[in-house]
Amino acid sequence: MMNPLIIKLGGVLLDSEEALERLFSALVNYRESHQRPLVIVHGGGCVVDELMKGLNLPVKKKNGLRVTPADQIDIITGALAGTANKTLLAWAKKHQIAAVGLFLGDGDSVKVTQLDEELGHVGLAQPGSPKLINSLLENGYLPVVSSIGVTDEGQLMNVNADQAATALAATLGADLILLSDVSGILDGKGQRIAEMTAAKAEQLIEQGIITDGMIVKVNAALDAARTLGRPVDIASWRYAEQLPALFNGMPMGTRILA
């Protein structure tokens, strides 16, 4: 089996029918013409934010990571492993793709520990066992994995989806594409940066050009590139016609170098 490609979905993609239609059409085209197995990893920040707003619960973030108190982890699990995951499975079904919905704890695919007590139920993801997902891929399934994990003590944890995708890529020896709302990392003039090294990222963070959630994304991509020993792409889902080329390894956004 060829080494898999993990496509991490994020941003408002899950909220946009047009975007999901474009993405799944591109996935169908890719799967028809390529043998390479695909895995989707997703968060669902926008789904969670909407739910929190509806329930009048505050959304707190620390260094770009969502603070998840004990009384909110069940709600967030429902939103990510439930609503967001099953929405993607429904789109797969609509496009005749045989998909399986998972969370990080299934088959111990990604090991999760608590990241920081101050963040509450927020997990640190580390590589786990490839057995379950490899067996699904060998049988032609598309695994769709939510970024909810579970500790060895049985505590549910909310994991940053970029970091979850990185850990799963390390588990499977997979290539990784982080799809988001932006077409890559932008410089101070709003121009896309084609390639990024750790030194350049540090410089842009110091200058305040890379901020908030993008810091988490860039650090996750740098961590992934280092861990995997291969480049990681950050790109946009907005340009559907470019997606098959992107899945083929053509750089379309910002390529993060190890």
Curated annotation (Swiss-Prot):
GO terms for biological process: arginine biosynthetic process via ornithine; L-arginine biosynthetic process. ATP binds at residues 181-186, 209-211. The record marks 8, 217 as: Transition state stabilizer. SUPFAM superfamilies: Carbamate kinase-like (SSF53633). Substrate binds at residues 44-45, 66, 158. GO terms for molecular function: acetylglutamate kinase activity; ATP binding. It catalyses: N-acetyl-L-glutamate + ATP = N-acetyl-L-glutamyl 5-phosphate + ADP. InterPro entries: AceGlu_kinase-like_sf, AcgluKinase_fam, ArgB, Asp/Glu/Uridylate_kinase, NAGK-NC. It comes from the Bacteria. It is found in: Cytoplasm. Pathway: Amino-acid biosynthesis; L-arginine biosynthesis; N(2)-acetyl-L-ornithine from L-glutamate: step 2/4. Pfam families: AA_kinase. CDD domains: AAK_NAGK-NC (cd04249). It is an enzyme of class 2 (transferase). The keyword Kinase applies. Its EC number is 2.7.2.8. Homodimer. NCBIfam families: argB (TIGR00761). Catalyzes the ATP-dependent phosphorylation of N-acetyl-L-glutamate. Belongs to the acetylglutamate kinase family. ArgB subfamily. This is Acetylglutamate kinase. It comes from Shigella flexneri. The gene is argB.
